[in-house]
Regions:
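Membrane-interacting alpha-helical segments
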Residues: 1-7
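Long, structured ligand/cofactor-binding scaffold of large enzymes
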Residues: 8-11, 15-144
């Protein structure tokens, strides 16, 4: 699932209320990073003032997007966890192993051949566990 409008609507419908609770507990304005992190706490009962480097916090992300260069290890760890599917919408984007040299066409062809084993693994694991797979040339996960 690449774009889930209902998920976005639900998140923003509850956003102001969640931020209000956080401000009430912390008694101060919040940075953008704090707003993002506190609205993604795994359990609302965890709401407290956290100390950097001291406290451990569990989060529940809305989605997971992985790039090809690091998704390999993440997916191996996921497989070892013994889960049947991802808990949140997840995607693998094959864009980081493509080296820009001669142009889009030749560079994608070279990357596809050079990284065939990696791409095959990522595609197969993604298919097995219901994870979206964006093949080389399908787009980039973020802007340079």
């Amino acid at each position: 699932m690449v774009y889930d409008l209902d998920m976005l609507k639900a998140f923003y419908a509850s956003f102001e209320k969640k931020i209000g609770r956080v401000r009430a507990v912390l008694q101060r304005p919040l940075t953008l990073a704090e707003k993002i992190l506190y609205t993604h706490l795994y359990d609302d009962a965890q709401l407290k003032n956290y100390e950097r480097g001291e406290d451990y916090v569990n989060f529940r992300p809305d989605r997971v997007a992985m790039q090809d260069a690091t998704a390999q290890m993440a997916l191996l760890q996921f497989i070892n966890a013994g889960k049947d599917s991802a808990a949140v919408p997840s995607t693998v984007h094959c864009d980081h192993l493509i080296q820009a040299y001669k142009g889009a066409g030749p560079d994608i062809a070279t990357a596809t051949e050079t990284n065939r084993e990696v791409y095959d693994f990522l595609r197969d694991v993604s298919s097995r566990f219901g994870i979206g797979f964006w093949k080389p040339g399908a787009g980039i996960i973020h802007q340079v």
